[in-house]
Amino acid sequence: MSKYDIIVLGSGPGGYVTAIRASQLGLKTAVIEKESLGGVCLNWGCIPTKALLKSAQVFEYLKHAEDYGLKVKDAAHDFDAVVKRSRGVADGMSNGVKFLMKKNKIDVIEGFGTLKKGKKVDVDGKEYSADHIIIATG
C-alpha cells in the first residue's frame, strides 16, 4: 500500500491547485483522477466550449468583413476542423496540468477512487492511504 501525506480525489481546478500547493509545502501528494487531468471544465465544458464559440465568432467576422472594408472570398466552415481545434485546445491545457503535476512531484493515479475506512482510498483494487484526503470532485 502506498502512503501519502495528502491524497486529492479529482484534478479539476480545485483539486490540482490544492495538490500543487500541498506539494510545494513539502507534503507527499497524490491526485486520483478517473478521466482526464483538469476536470470537466477544462476537458469537456468551459474551455472547449469557448474554443467553439471563438471559431463561430471568427466565422461571423468573415461573413461581415465588407462592413470593415475587407473582401473575403469563399468563407466556409469545416465543422470537423472546428471540433478538432476545440479538442486540441483542451488537450493542450490538460497536458499543461500534467506538466505541473510532474514538475511538482505529484503522483497521478488514474482510475476511480473509492473512500475506505481508516483514511484509505481504493483505486481499481489497489489501496492507498493518506493522513488527509481531500474530496475535490466538483
How would you name each of these model-derived features?
Residues G15-Y16:
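N-terminal Rossmann-fold NAD(P) dinucleotide-binding loop
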Residues M1-G12:
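Beta1/beta-strand and adjacent pyrophosphate-binding region of the FAD-binding site
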